[in-house]
Amino acid sequence: FPYITGQYGGAAFVLLYLLFLVILGLPVMVMEFAVGRASQKSSALAFDTLQPSRRWHWFSWWGFIGCLILMMFYTTVGGWMLSYVVKMGTGAFNGLDAAGSAEVFGAMLANPGELIGWMLAVCVIGFLVCSMGLQKGVERITKVMMTCLLLVMVVLVVRSLTLPGAQAGIEFYLIPDFGKLFAGETASEQWATFGNAVYAAMGQAFFTLSLGISAMEVFGSYIGKDRSLTGEAVRICGLDTGVALLAGLIIFPACFAFGVNPGEG
C-alpha cells in the first residue's frame, strides 16, 4: 500500500483507494462470507453445495489455485522478513545509507539458498499454526501477533514522525494533490496516468482483503449465524485499512527524512 501510494502521489491515491474499498471491497467481502457460511464447506466445494446444477462452481477451483499462488507470494515475502529480522539483530544494516541497504537486499535476492531456506521456515511455521486448528491455532496466535504488530507500529510511527524533515513526508501523505493523478504532458498521457491510478486503487482494494480467490469463503464457513457478516467485514476492513495507514505514517516521513524516493517501493 505505501509503495503504490508513493507511486501515485500520496493522499490523492489514498482517497481513491478508500472509495473502492467502500464500494467494492466491503460488499464483495460480505458476499464471500455469505457463500462460506451458507455452504459450511471449503472454497472448492462451496459452489457445488449451493448451486449443484450450475456451471459457476467451476470458478471455485480457479479461486483455489489463486490461494496457492497467493501463498507462494506470502511465504516468499515472509521469508524476506525473517531474514531481515536476523540481519537487523546481527547489525547488518548498521551505518548503511539507502544505497547500502539496497545492496544487502540485492545480495539476498542473488542467494537462492537463503531465499529457499527462509521460505521453508515460513512454511513450517504456517503448517504448525494451522495444525492446531482455526480457533486454537490461527485465531489465538493471530490475536497475540496483531496486538504486538500494532504496538510496534505505534512506536515506529512516533519515531518516524519525530525525525528531522519528517514534515514533508506527512504533507505528501496526508494532503491530497489531485494533479499527480493526472501527471503527463498531453491529455492522453494524463488520462492514462489516471486510469493506471484507478486500476491500482481497485486492485489494491481486492489484494489487501484477499478477495476474489475464495479465501474469505473459508473464514465465512466458521462465522456463526449469530454474527453479522456486514459487521465482521466492516471490522476487518477497518483494521486492515488502519494498519495500512499506520504503515504510511512510518514510511513516508522516514523516506523524506533520509532522502529516499517514496515511489521506489
What is the predicted function of each stretch?
Residues 11-17, 49, 57-61, 227-236:
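Membrane-interface alpha-helices at helix entry/exit sites of multi-pass transporters
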Residues 1, 143-265:
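Membrane-embedded translocation segments of transport machinery
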Residues 16-51, 75, 214, 258:
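Juxtamembrane transmembrane-helix boundary signature
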Residues 17-26, 63-89, 118-132, 147-160, ...:
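Hydrophobic core segments of alpha-helical transmembrane domains in multi-pass membrane transport
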Residues 3-8, 38, 43-62, 75-135, ...:
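Inter-helical loop and helix-membrane interface segments of multi-pass membrane transporters/permeases
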Residues 118-137, 209-225:
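Transmembrane alpha-helical segments in integral membrane proteins
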Residues 1-14, 19-23:
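N-terminal signal-anchor module of multipass membrane proteins
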